[in-house]
């Protein structure tokens, strides 16, 4: 072979995906390194990362493989799962995902690559979809307001418990729980209640009548299918100053009286059966709806209606001062990431079917259940009454029934030795009920029983009220109409399919198509979370493999994949620390040190674990103040439980003293929690578990490529050292020292293939290179923008980690232009803004990630330089201080094409500040949204159609 002939191994090109994932090619990397003054990526990394923490050896992971190879490997894993028809219920039900929704939302990067809608003007499409979701939930539950999703039904029930505690007049510490709630809900309530000093009492509705409690949780219909009349009980709880929360089923509420109509104060549930597959437990969009009086205490994000600068209706995140990143240690919930993508799917399922279609599905499901119940009773089998879709069958040999059912291709619910549950759903057919009946030795003539069998719902609890009367739920019922509606919404937004999203602390990197493909395979999507273990062997292999990958990347010893958001991972880590101290007889350790530069969820999570937060200082360079930590560690030595720190810091720097900080905390008996939000600066370079940290949460929706989905889903694994491993979250049915933190034992399991695929395709060298290029891209931006915007904090050698904070505050003094004006002006250039005023007010935090090409980085830099020139023009008097393109940004097509233009600058500067924008231009659908108006006039449901009508034209 001649020297110029490549080897077969080179031609096989196993690292092809690495080159697809990383934006700049090697020649561009060399060019960028020249700009920042380093000869190689390794030399740059040596200059950025403290020597004390650098990993001495490469990651012990396989080499990179191609997309084709990775898909073949994960196909072999998926094939080890066994897909039966699951009639297990317990909060999870079969559903048909309409193909138009599957292809155009779940599989569409315009929807799944978007970020949380903090920038309202470029998020109008998904916020309209979320308003639809809120309207759906509020209408069906009979409540006045609903939020834009929560993580799962059990978490939502726990949030309802704490909302009731905050809001009830009763001073009791007892929360009464219906003994027929779903088991996973009860498990999670136990986890949440104990650290907060809440006493749980579990019992029957009759016992609840006499109980002194601040709140009551009912399940309606209950976990065994029973539909009860709770009006008298609700009145009794209210008379004692308590609040009533109800966990419910949205499909059932198309037929049953809404909880709000019989007195409920808070209603929670899961929208999963509105078109979202089982997915072995998630992700699914839960919800909370409540009385208007409690809206300012409600957890989760809330979409509201405001007006824009032209007075037109516009959506925005409303009442944001409720949220954990603002309230910090005063927060009562740490909800951050929720389940926006799944909420959008559920809302569009309702839009597509409309109220009549939903009612038809519910009636069909109930009719099939009624016919099956009649057949079983006719054969002498005992079946409970007053049900919607779930039959509680008693007096049978359960083990024998389950064996026969599985042989016939069905899973039924395991309850105890002499009873089983059967939950029917949208997917159930005539053939299914015939087959299930035969398992019990019953035969049936479907049509004959249909004609002779009455419905099984109590007449006094049938729904009389209308729901989903807004035109959006009564218009888009043909596929063409829904397809075009979805396209119109997507076109209003900026997602990663159109532009870089340089949000600091958010890691908006490529979500590769190959990574996404396995998510919708039936072998992953159609597995109920409670199937027998031998039907989920593929999931076990996937989970074990991914946990081992994450252990290697982090240097910890064990990982739990149960937490279904970063905030839940934080909570799990702190629960592990708390349980560890208690296991050693040190229950008194309750102080958590948190630097003031920490992630906003940190103090909220600590508070939820019953810890008291002590905030420590940062120095003038943005570093954690080691001496202040030392002083506080000594001051609270006997009570010190933990420190929570983000590394690299939220200020975008690698702090030199991280090892010393760990030693200080350990000396005083505490544990070190390292927030993994910025792990994208560490993978393959340094491992927190090796420099003294005891626990971290990771964000698979940041570092490991699960898409953000417009505000969820996410996965927040909790990684720990060996001594904390016994205190990771328990699984359903376990009785260990720590309970569940999510409804499903493995959280949002169906999206785990995404991260597995990413790690497999990148390999050990690719993962390290991704980290290095993420650092390079951030430093390239900081260096090129240095003559125009100061980078607020830098680390050793004047370099940043993987993100940089641009300081706009000095310019506000000279020009009147603030960070928000810059953020809004970037929209005119087709960019999503960087993170605004976090972690430092008046700044912009930029994180480009490794996936952005040199072309895209330069496009962003050119936009920022042009904005700086406009600010200079204001400073020089060439542009008016009040009437300028920054103060009036963003500019809509309607505004710049209006017959009258009254501004003191030309239309072309407003619309096309750079020539390149004439070739490709994003037009925001609304002008700047009025935040103050939105918070003063809270409206969180679909906008009435007449609000969009133009004023009548005078004749």
Swiss-Prot record:
InterPro entries noted in UniProt: GcvP, GDC-P_C, GDC-P_N, GDC_P, PyrdxlP-dep_Trfase, PyrdxlP-dep_Trfase_major, PyrdxlP-dep_Trfase_small
GO biological process, one term: glycine decarboxylation via glycine cleavage system
Disulfide pattern: none
Transmembrane segments: none
Keyword Plastid attributed: no
GO cellular component: cytosol; glycine cleavage complex
Keyword list, A-Z: Oxidoreductase, Pyridoxal phosphate
EC number: 1.4.4.2
Biological function: The glycine cleavage system catalyzes the degradation of glycine. The P protein binds the alpha-amino group of glycine through its pyridoxal phosphate cofactor; CO(2) is released and the remaining methylamine moiety is then transferred to the lipoamide cofactor of the H protein.
Entry similarity comment: Belongs to the GcvP family.
Protein name, entry field: Glycine dehydrogenase (decarboxylating)
Native source species: Stenotrophomonas maltophilia (strain R551-3)
Gene from which the chain derives: gcvP
